[in-house]
């Protein structure tokens, strides 16, 4: 263990007793699931929403992009705030705002209004995602953190399995705004669960007290840290490949390959099972296999999926080639996310865990939001842009991670 890691480890809060750990896992897993819930439950409704609001595929995809941009921007605010104010207050404020924004989405009269509200919804929900990661870092480090992140992947992974299935079934009985009514209820439930079941993990004596200048200094130190930036970019590029699939596949699979909304939701759920399975394999291997090797394996799976997808689209293999490629792209995320996050946060003191978590989230969702519209640039009749974008991003993620493997870590200044 490095001196930095040892120093950071001495600042860890006491983990909850074994009997309370399942409650912590469920709450934090549900909080990190706000992103897939906000995005994936809505996916089967995209073509119908596009028709109802008389808008094109690119504008419809912007309702996804706006949510992702909000998720990135909100993390940049909520993470540093949680370093100064503690974890609970910013978390509860964000969840309350998320519920209100989701309710307003139900009555959005135009696609422009919906885009704006989705931006707010994403920014509010970001508090849950960034603070959940910071709480894990408050309590765990290194392989222990990687194992906990992988366990969260099990809970988090259920969201992309269930969300599109629930969304597809909802569309059988309600119009597309009904999806946002369900998201409103989820926001209220998470607010109450966090209020009653989540203790403060960053006591006043361990908080950042230097104000905005200290936060800016911590950001500069982290960005200049080759290991942190490299692993953060690897997470961001890999997620961008995944989000290109998320935003492009409703149109590609339903409009080009003729899948029904229900068939699409089932295929999406199967791919999400791959994320869960890979994440649990990573949890079993963490501590016995180096985290860098687990990350490399995940990135290799994502890159292989991108290659299969591109070949299938260019060669005209149809769903028999497209679906396996998308499955590999998704499954690899189960190894990439937990291990890259643990490597990036390893040895960082809890007083900057929120800021570090925010920077990782900004990279992840900003790159994802930028990549998403590329899937539809050539119009609704071709899957080539989606396949090319996914393959290129997967290769870039693997190259960045390989370049920083073994790089020394620095600690943000006081």
What are these regions (language model features)?
Residues 109, 113, 141-144, 150-196:
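Helix-loop-helix hairpin linking two adjacent transmembrane segments in secondary transporters
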Residues 117-158:
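Cytoplasmic helix-loop-helix junction between adjacent transmembrane helices
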Residues 73-112:
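Conserved MFS/SLC helix-loop-helix module at the cytosolic interface between two early adjacent transmembrane helices
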Residues 185-206, 400-404:
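C-terminal membrane-cytosol helix-exit motif in multi-pass small-molecule transporters
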